[in-house]
Amino acid sequence: MTAQLIDGKAIAANLRQQIAQRVTERRQQGLRVPGLAVILVGTDPASQVYVAHKRKDCEEVGFLSQAYDLPADTSQDELLALIDRLNDDPAIDGILVQLPLPAHLDASLLLERIHPDKDVDGFHPYNIGRLAQRMPLLRPCTPKGIMTLLASTGADLYGMDAVVVGASNIVGRPMALELLLGGCTVTVTHRFTRDLAAHVSRADLVVVAAGKPGLVKGEWIKEGAIVIDVGINRQADGRLVGDVEYDVAARRASWITPVPGGVGPMTRACLLENTLHAAEHLHD
């Protein structure tokens, strides 16, 4: 068996096109365009690249984009005051604080200061709680994007044994909630899991988000399983690789995401989708 590729780049491009069309319709109806504020603290190179991509995405779909590039020594109180101002700004539908933050800043406190209706990353405890109670509002972008990728395969998730490798607040935990909502029987593995191979090898669907290149061996993948690789790791030779041993896994899986070009583009597209949703359903 050779796996079919889940082309996140193409699916994300289609989603951006739909969002841009809706923004055009809003303009024609005399409605304001959605607004996204992006806060970057410090000069972390990877964060600067991610933020540049997000701003480019906003321009592509016609959003209002406000950039706040702040020095690394910005204080907690200064950031809280900025978030308060953006919470009160009617032109802004979404507020994004780029992670990671400098060590002196409390990320949890800052993210919780964002009004839940403007939490387009979907990290606020209120939005995670809504997802847990099967009433999602603004959903975490990466898990939401993965559900869109899974839908593109046409696979029926109901009753599938799904294994999530990694239990972070950003991907693993909300991913488990999304899969539960999708009808899967879900197992979450983490760094204390004793026999990772045993869990992965029985899974109909594997979502790997551990940040460790090649952690999941291709031979562990069950024949015909769906493999979603969230990991993106730069090797010494400059190559980007995922958390799954791709070449072997692709010979066993029915569907697999490439790295790069799989999950990453969908995360960005879902940030735009959340911002549009906030504008249309929470703020208009």
Curated annotation (Swiss-Prot):
Pathway named in the protein's UniProt entry: One-carbon metabolism; tetrahydrofolate interconversion
Enzyme Commission number(s) from the entry: 1.5.1.5, 3.5.4.9
Source taxonomy: Bacteria, Pseudomonadati, Pseudomonadota, Gammaproteobacteria, Pseudomonadales
Family: Belongs to the tetrahydrofolate dehydrogenase/cyclohydrolase family.
Pfam families in the record: THF_DHG_CYH, THF_DHG_CYH_C
GO CC term (a single one): cytosol
PANTHER family: C-1-TETRAHYDROFOLATE SYNTHASE, CYTOPLASMIC (PTHR48099:SF5), C-1-TETRAHYDROFOLATE SYNTHASE, CYTOPLASMIC-RELATED (PTHR48099)
Keyword Hydrolase in annotation: yes
Oligomeric and partner information: Homodimer.
CDD domains: NAD_bind_m-THF_DH_Cyclohyd (cd01080)
Protein's job: Catalyzes the oxidation of 5,10-methylenetetrahydrofolate to 5,10-methenyltetrahydrofolate and then the hydrolysis of 5,10-methenyltetrahydrofolate to 10-formyltetrahydrofolate.
The entry's keywords: Amino-acid biosynthesis, Histidine biosynthesis, Hydrolase, Methionine biosynthesis, Multifunctional enzyme, NADP, One-carbon metabolism, Oxidoreductase, Purine biosynthesis
Positions with a binding annotation for NADP(+): 166-168, 232
Catalyses which reaction(s): (6R)-5,10-methylene-5,6,7,8-tetrahydrofolate + NADP(+) = (6R)-5,10-methenyltetrahydrofolate + NADPH; (6R)-5,10-methenyltetrahydrofolate + H2O = (6R)-10-formyltetrahydrofolate + H(+)
Protein name: Bifunctional protein FolD
Xref: InterPro entries: Aminoacid_DH-like_N_sf, NAD(P)-bd_dom_sf, THF_DH/CycHdrlase, THF_DH/CycHdrlase_cat_dom, THF_DH/CycHdrlase_CS, THF_DH/CycHdrlase_NAD-bd_dom
Annotated gene: folD
HAMAP family found in the cross-reference section: THF_DHG_CYH
Gene Ontology molecular functions: methenyltetrahydrofolate cyclohydrolase activity; methylenetetrahydrofolate dehydrogenase (NADP+) activity
